[in-house]
């Protein structure tokens, strides 16, 4: 096998969920049928790696010092939604009418993996809360053990700065049937039920 082909296969393996076989299929596809697409992919990847950084305010990906959301004068600066990843921010932007600002952790607390408050930029978040503009912090971390631990830490941080913490509701999926919902989800939904208005 060609050394360059081996390097291409190994390069594809850096992507999440891509093992040896998938990487091999991708490499063969690019070389057999999509050489022009491969050139565009290489150019876009090279350009993005060089030019895309993090917003100094929210830590989202951007080509500028401050992203378009943080720079927008039409956003509600009293609400700050804290998410684990840029993909989570994008999901909230597309699915809701949320008009506040964001803070992207780029992960979640995981002491076993060496990810603590410093790695998540929580010192920067603390400074932002201390500035006094934010009145509500919406905690939108995932419903995993690490996500819940992160949410607890964030709620404490918000309270230290007299900011009201709120957490996204969790439980029954829209259109879901009780008999098909897993026990943990059903138990959580039942325990956090709310009054019908």
UniProtKB/Swiss-Prot annotation:
A Gene Ontology annotation in the biological process aspect, one of them, is: DNA recombination
Q: Which Pfam families match?
A: RecR_C, RecR_HhH, RecR_ZnF, Toprim_4
Q: What family does the entry list? A: Belongs to the RecR family.
Q: Which GO terms describe its molecular function?
A: DNA binding; zinc ion binding
Task: List the InterPro entries hit by this protein, alphabetically.
Answer: DNA_Rcmb_RecR, Rcmb_RecR, Rcmb_RecR_Znf, TOPRIM_dom, TOPRIM_RecR
Name of the protein described by the UniProt record: Recombination protein RecR
Against HAMAP family, the record matches this protein to: RecR
Positions of the Toprim domain: 78-173
What does it do? May play a role in DNA repair. It seems to be involved in an RecBC-independent recombinational process of DNA repair. It may act with RecF and RecO.
The stretches annotated as zinc fingers (C4-type) lie at: 55-70
């Amino acid at each position: 096998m060609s050394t360059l082909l081996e390097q291409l296969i190994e390069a594809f393996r850096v992507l999440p969920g891509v093992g040896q076989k998938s990487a091999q299929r991708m490499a063969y596809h690019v070389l057999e049928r999509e050489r022009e697409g491969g050139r565009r992919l290489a150019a876009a990847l090279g350009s993005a790696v060089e030019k895309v950084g993090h917003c100094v305010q929210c830590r989202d990906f951007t080509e500028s010092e401050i992203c378009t959301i943080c720079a927008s004068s039409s956003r509600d600066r009293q609400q700050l939604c804290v998410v684990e990843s840029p993909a989570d921010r994008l999901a909230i932007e597309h699915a809701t009418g949320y008009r506040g600002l964001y803070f992207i952790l780029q992960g979640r607390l995981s002491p076993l993996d060496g990810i603590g408050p410093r790695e998540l930029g929580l010192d920067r978040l603390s400074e932002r809360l201390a500035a006094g503009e934010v009145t509500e912090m919406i905690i939108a971390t995932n419903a995993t053990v690490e996500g819940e631990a992160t949410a607890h830490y964030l709620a404490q941080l918000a309270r230290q700065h007299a900011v009201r913490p709120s957490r996204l509701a969790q439980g029954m999926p829209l259109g879901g049937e009780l008999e098909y919902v897993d026990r943990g989800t059903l138990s959580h939904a039942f325990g956090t039920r709310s009054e019908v208005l």
